[in-house]
Curated annotation (Swiss-Prot):
Keyword annotations from UniProtKB, A to Z: Cytoplasm, DNA-directed RNA polymerase, Nucleotidyltransferase, Transcription, Transferase
The protein's name: DNA-directed RNA polymerase subunit Rpo11
GO biological process terms held by the UniProt record: DNA-templated transcription
Nucleus recorded as keyword: no
UniProt superkingdom: Archaea
Catalytic reaction(s) noted: RNA(n) + a ribonucleoside 5'-triphosphate = RNA(n+1) + diphosphate
Subunit structure as annotated in this protein's UniProt entry: Part of the RNA polymerase complex.
NCBIfam families per UniProt: PRK01146.1-2
Amino acid sequence: MSYINIIEKSENSIELELVNDDHSLSNALKESLLSKKGVVIASYGVEHPVLHPETGRYISNPTLVLKTEGVLAEKVLKEALRDIIDLCSNCLEEL
């Protein structure tokens, strides 16, 4: 299971680590953030992944960097996460 480790946080920037993730949440979150007004930078990096012995998935701890201007970084991050949840909910309803 993934969880978030906040590395650094200020009003206009957040750097966080998504523990035991791959590109799935990291990329979706980056794309959602880039669509938001006031986002200056939304990017993530992934170290070389390792094979998880229980799941057989390649995992890593991607680091996401968000920088904003004129809007609180935490607020934009929460909006982007809600957008991803809404997208998944809509997909489930259509099945």
